[in-house]
Design a protein with these regions (language model features):
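Low-complexity, Gly/Ser/Thr/Pro-rich intrinsically disordered linker/tail segments
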Residues: 151-195
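Peptidoglycan glycan-strand catalytic modules in the bacterial/periplasmic cell-wall system
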Residues: 1-163
Length: 195
């Protein structure tokens, strides 16, 4: 689950100090191209700060507070503890908070028993928890969302946290699997999920 969340939400989580220059640059470029805000640059640490201590208002003063709280979290907590808090406070759907209730609601199992494709699905909905997902969602998602899950799974494979059987189960094309096996490639951030 952790690998899926890092892949979908914050690829540099274990290497940055709470802020990602690359995410800021990528978000700026994507937002500029779209002419509106379509992507944020919040790291997992920033999201913990925001969800635990701040309101949802979007002001410069609140962003300033978020910056200082994020720095304090990074200085006082391990990355593992920050991730644990994150997984247990974020919303995974209408009224569903925490990875345990999310895994139970969507897949009727505890988080430790999730398959990589199920973890990828849960990671994929973090950005849009209010989309009104139902139990057993993998049978009801669009082709575009499947492609997004496949992309996440390919990145998880590149990180060494999924195997070829997981890719095949998710329907990753054999040609893509061959490419991944030949060259695991460099990690790149995953784009925003489909609308």
């Amino acid at each position: 689950m952790i690998s899926a969340v890092i892949t979908a939400e914050d690829g540099g989580f274990f290497s940055h100090k709470g802020f990602s220059q690359r995410a800021i640059k990528d978000a700026f470029a994507e937002n500029l191209e779209a002419g509106r805000i379509v992507r944020g640059a919040s790291t997992i640490s920033m999201q913990v700060a925001k969800n635990l201590f701040l309101t949802r208002e979007r002001t410069f003063s609140r962003k300033f507070e978020e910056t200082f709280i994020t720095m304090a979290l990074e200085q006082n907590l391990s990355k593992e503890r920050i991730m644990e808090i994150y997984l247990n406070i974020i919303e995974w759907g209408d009224g569903i908070y925490g990875i345990g209730p999310a895994a139970s609601f969507y897949f009727n199992k505890p988080p430790r028993n999730l398959k990589p494709v199920e973890s990828a699905f849960l990671a994929s909905i973090i950005a849009r928890p209010g989309k009104n997902w139902k139990p057993d969602p993998l049978t009801k998602i669009s082709e575009g969302w499947w492609k997004y899950l496949q992309l996440i799974l390919c990145k998880i494979y590149e990180r060494g946290d999924a195997d070829i059987a997981d890719l095949r189960e998710a329907g990753v094309p054999e040609e893509r699997i061959r490419e991944l096996v030949e060259d695991k490639g460099q990690y790149e951030s995953v784009p925003s999920p489909p609308e």
